[in-house]
Amino acid sequence: ATAICHITLDCRKFETQCEKCYLLPLPIGCDIAKRTWQRKELIKGRSHIIYIACSKWLQNEAKKSALIGTNVIESIPNPIDTNIFCKTNKNEARKKLGLPTDKRLILFASQRVTNNNKGMSYLVEACEKMAKQHPEILVNTAVVVLGGHAEELCNSFRLPMYPLGYVVDTQKIVDVYNAVDVFVTPSLSDNLPNTIMEAMACGVPCVGFEVGGI
């Protein structure tokens, strides 16, 4: 529904025409965003395309795009296999991952945890405020970070932090969900993240900002 971007944040140009994209250097003679938009407008048979969004929020956003026009847009959430993503024994999951069994664990997960849009800085700030108001959490609570570049955040928290890195093994991801007490996803903009649905399927409460499909 846009010319080139996957995350629009506060930009609403897609409602009329994408041009002079803030994600790109200032155009010198050639506006890539505008040219790409115009090429999409010329796609033959475009009016007969049925679009599928994976959340109601994305469906509603796409309907506002001038590229979509009057085309049909349906919403079908990504499926989650609840035979795989399901609740298991918390202590056993922690032992498998080498995580403490005597602490409350907060999970943050992202493909790349240093991505500013994922809101890690807000979790760091929230943990700092909680530590000032309730110093005991420095002893009884820890943060688990799942995703690429997790080790770069080791010095960001006053709370104990356990970087698990980028994990592709599905069973290990299920163990991570089952090992924690709460999943925090402070994204500034997001669709309907699979991580939230997976965590909830494992019986883990989720906390996030009221943005996008969250």
Positions of PLM-derived features:
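Aromatic "clamp/platform" in nucleotide-sugar-dependent glycosyltransferases that forms part
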Residues: 188
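Nucleotide-activated donor-binding/catalytic signature segment of Leloir-type glycosyltransferases, i.e.
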Residues: 137-140, 147-174, 182
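Short alpha-helical segment that forms part of, or immediately flanks, the ligand-binding pocket
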Residues: 174, 193, 197-201
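Conserved donor-binding/catalytic core segment of Leloir-type glycosyltransferases
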Residues: 100-118, 124-128
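A short, active-site helix/loop in glycosyltransferases that binds the activated sugar's phosphate group
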Residues: 27-75, 80-84, 90
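A short helix/loop element that forms part of the nucleotide-sugar donor recognition site in Leloir-type
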Residues: 86-99
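A short alpha->beta transition loop at the rim of the catalytic pocket in nucleotide-sugar-dependent
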Residues: 181, 203
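Short hydrophobic beta-strand element within catalytic cores of glycosyltransferases
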Residues: 205-208
